[in-house]
Amino acid sequence: MTQLENEVPDKDHLRFFSLGGSNEVGRSCHILQYKGKTLMLDAGIHPAHQGLASLPYYDEFDLSTIDLLLISHFHLDHAASLPYVMQRTNFRGRVFMTHPTKAIYRWLLNDFVKVTSIGDSPGQDSSNDNLYSDEDLAESFDRIETIDYHSTMEVNGIKFTAFHAGHVLGAAMFQIEIAGVRVLFTGDYSREVDRHLNSAEVPPQSSDVIIVESTFGTATHEPRQNRERKLTQLIHTVVSKGGRVLLPVFALGRAQEIMLILDEYWQNHKEELGNGQVPIFYASNLAKKCMSVFQTYVNMMNDDIRKKFKDSQTNPFIFKNISYLKNLDEFEDFGPSVMLASPGMLQNGLSRDILEKWCPEEKNLVLVTGYSVEGTMAKYLLLEPEAIPSVHNPEITIPRRCQVDEITFAAHVDFRENLEFIELIGASNIILVHGESNPMGRLKSALLSNFSSLKDTENEVHVFNPRNCVFVDIEFKDVKVARAVGKIIEDLDEFITEEDALKNEKRITEIHEEDPETEESKTEIVKEENEKIVSGILVSDEKNFDLSLVSLSDLREHYQQLSTTVLTERQTVHLDCKSELVYWHICQMFGDVDVYIDEENVSLKNINPEFKTRKIKKGELEIKIMGDVILNIVDNVATLQWTQNVISDSVADSVMAILLSVESAPASIKMSSKSCGHHHGHDDHTTKIKNISRVFKEQFGDTFTLFLNEEDSKEEIKGTINLGKTTACINFSKMVVEECNSNPLKGRIESLLKIGSDLVAPLC
């Protein structure tokens, strides 16, 4: 066992350390420990290394102690070692990611598993050298669970909520809560609204700790419009002179963003570009599969993409000017062209093959658009070397005469965006990850300078930039707060209501003391404060860090696992009707009825085999209702027996009400099987809208108002929702949201309109 495995943090200290991704970009993997809970954040590989050397330092920690693993997004440096963790180590925790991330994850890693090799020795069986196999990938995939944005889940006392992070489709930042301490893990995030993704969200709840990326350190991005213009102009210039342009990209993420830019530019400049004489290709083994995911999750993208999809009824990711290449055998390399090829780091694959083919010609261009990790060919190429080694035989060098340029479209925050976001979060502890040492060090200095005015105060901000496998221990004083539940809450609500009523009638005693010299008055206000003393049982749930104050009468309802006395109740009532009539009424009221004894076969069901050996009396009927309440009828005497609890008590009360009223019930006097004679006409449009508006009334209560002029049937029917500063205007006649200043609320209203149309209207 190593030092990391042996040391356990003090119960009042939150411990953070990285197995990868600290003071480096690649193999992101971070560990959080607090109150006996352990979770891992991301499980990536280092793109500049191969085999076991590319993994985080998993041998430095006992992975069997991990309760939960959260994956922020599908990029290889954040998710590619997940199958290794799940199948090749003693990890036994649960794994969560968003739905789009899981959809992309398997395809991306299926391709990756073909090139991950531990040994480089020729003649070895590569199937035995891979970090993991296709079978490992399939088995791990089945164990991965998904989480929706803005939903909160709990695993072994660890609560976590997913929020939009921008960056790529499906990327999430997680706000984690353990024993009242909240930690925000941003993963890779972007605060810039691009052509298809929204910017990262600010969680509504504050955080005590933020684990934030520092990829670009203190650098500032050029405005997006300028970068797009430079990109298109540079490519246009090269292809106009007969050159070829290679854009190494990740298979998913920035590739789709750049394709949206180029497809629009090619569409607007057809004549200048020879009406299709300069083709654009997207070369990736996963090209079509990846694009199908983007076409599926259009509704999770920004308003611009959704509007295009809705207005034109065509998917924006079905490109008019871009063709797909699965391999270079299909590629006819004649004349100028633009090639987007993966992988983005140029370490191997299609992008590396094209680089080696095109780099000897001066008229060609390699344009790097993403972040380049130290040690990769993409980073090396930016130094403009005279030659590059062949990927298939490193002893052979290839002259590099092509142009090399960089216009970054990497979806990472710059310094200004990062600082603004950190200030909005307001955490007093900042942990920097995902950045090379120098940019990260500069960012730390800038943050400390920015928050220097808070030094030596209660709100002092601490900034950490630990190296891999170095602990950061943060102390949190344990404040125990009990949560009142059940009847105690009702008593307190009643007391508060009474106090509010009394406050309006309360007289404030004013004592005037006159100063004879100045004739000024002093006023002293005397206020009486009433207090309410409540009593109950304090229940501690150490697993989930909950402390609850529960009334004795509510104890069994809220904490069924506690040992309590079970009471069985029995009541008897005389009947003046046949058991057949009672059985009919019971079946009408309750769907869950099991027949134990039926001597006269009134139920037309077989008797439970367990009771065939028991002595049965003439005309006896015994049934079990809702799984617990037993009703026995024999000789016109009904006996009701049940175990005392909230649900069974309610069921027993209902059954007893039936027994006492069965003789006089209208249905008992006359049971009709005929259909009614009157006509059911189809409801008009106004009635349907009224029914749909009931869905909104249930969801939003008094904040929803429907404007309906029943005298003028041609006037459009509208409704409004007012939630504080957030307002929305809905046109029910057209079933659209006309105005809304909140995207989350707008999405929710659109979903309700669809539900109302599909479910409520057809029933009208």
UniProtKB/Swiss-Prot annotation:
Q: Give the main localization category.
A: nucleus
Q: Cite a GO CC annotation.
A: mRNA cleavage and polyadenylation specificity factor complex
Does the record's keyword annotation contain Calcium?
no
Quote the record's binding site residues for Zn(2+) 1: 73, 75, 167, 188
Q: Name one GO biological process term.
A: mRNA processing
- Top enzyme class, one word, equals hydrolase
Q: Under the GO molecular function aspect, what terms does this record hold?
A: 5'-3' RNA exonuclease activity; metal ion binding; RNA binding; RNA endonuclease activity
**Pfam families linked to this entry:** Beta-Casp, CPSF73-100_C, Lactamase_B_6, RMMBL
Disulfide-linked positions:
none
Q: Which CDD domains match?
A: CPSF3-like_MBL-fold
KW Hydrolase (keyword) present: yes
Identify the EC number(s). Answer: 3.1.27.-
Location in the cell: Nucleus
| Residue sites binding Zn(2+) 2 per the record | 77-78, 188, 434
Q: Which SUPFAM superfamilies match?
A: Metallo-hydrolase/oxidoreductase
Q: Where is the active site?
A: 412 (proton donor)
Any idea which UniProt keywords this protein has? Answer: Endonuclease, Hydrolase, Metal-binding, mRNA processing, Nuclease, Nucleus, Zinc
Signal peptide span per the entry? Answer: none
Its biological purpose: Component of the cleavage factor I (CF I) involved in pre-mRNA 3'-end processing.
Q: Which family does it belong to?
A: Belongs to the metallo-beta-lactamase superfamily. RNA-metabolizing metallo-beta-lactamase-like family. CPSF2/YSH1 subfamily.
Q: What is this protein called?
A: Endoribonuclease YSH1
**Which source organism?**
Kluyveromyces lactis (strain ATCC 8585 / CBS 2359 / DSM 70799 / NBRC 1267 / NRRL Y-1140 / WM37)
Query: From which lineage does this chain's organism come?
Result: Eukaryota, Fungi, Dikarya, Ascomycota, Saccharomycotina
